[in-house]
Amino acid sequence: MSEKKAVFLTGASGNMGFAGFQELYQRKDQFNLVLLNRGSDKNREKFKFYANDPSVKLVWGDLTNYEDVLACVTGADYILHVGGMVSPAADYFPKRTMKTNIGAIENIIRAIKAQPDPDAVKLVYIGTVAQTGDRNPPIHWGRTGDPIKISVYDHYAISKTIAEAKVAESGLKHWVSLRQTGIL
């Protein structure tokens, strides 16, 4: 079997991130996982089971802190950037939302570029279908190529659109942006 790939996963304490973590963890024979989580009591409790697992490296920190991000990006083959501030909190705290969602991707891009071979790192960025606006009648579905049309006062969508543009304009060799739907 080939060498295990290193995966840096952001947002592992959130709904989508934890589901992604669980899927990757089931394949820990193929991956070494690095998780950057805020050091809250809730998060520490959630991940205490994995604290002594050599295939999981738990980093307690902040996506808006470049040094924390750099420590996690260093050595990563893949970065799955699922973390961020989401609605409804994103709309109550617009300044924090911008700092978190835009600052995090700026730190990730900068950290990738600081690697000895940045072209070897693959980035998966998670955006949102909210970037294309609401889906009121008569349009209930989204399609590839739909224009960016953010709803008024949707700070989450604004921050994710700016962050996605930063990825697209970053000059990174390997990246993709996926726009997730709502999670219930």
What kind of feature is each model-predicted range?
Residues M85-V86, V129-N136, T181-L184:
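Active-site segment of SDR-like NAD(P)-dependent oxidoreductases
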Residues K99, N136-S177:
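Catalytic helix-loop patch of NAD(P)-dependent Rossmann-fold dehydrogenases
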Residues T64, R96-N107, D154, I158-S159:
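Glycine-rich NAD(P)-binding loop of the Rossmann-fold in SDR/ketoreductase-type enzymes
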Residues G103-Y153:
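Conserved Rossmann-fold NAD(P)-dependent oxidoreductase catalytic core, especially the SDR/UDP-sugar
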Residues N52, V56, W60-T100:
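NAD(P)H-binding glycine-rich loop region in Rossmannoid oxidoreductase-like domains
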Residues D29-K42:
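Conserved glycine-rich Rossmann-like NAD(P)H-binding loop of the short-chain dehydrogenase/reductase
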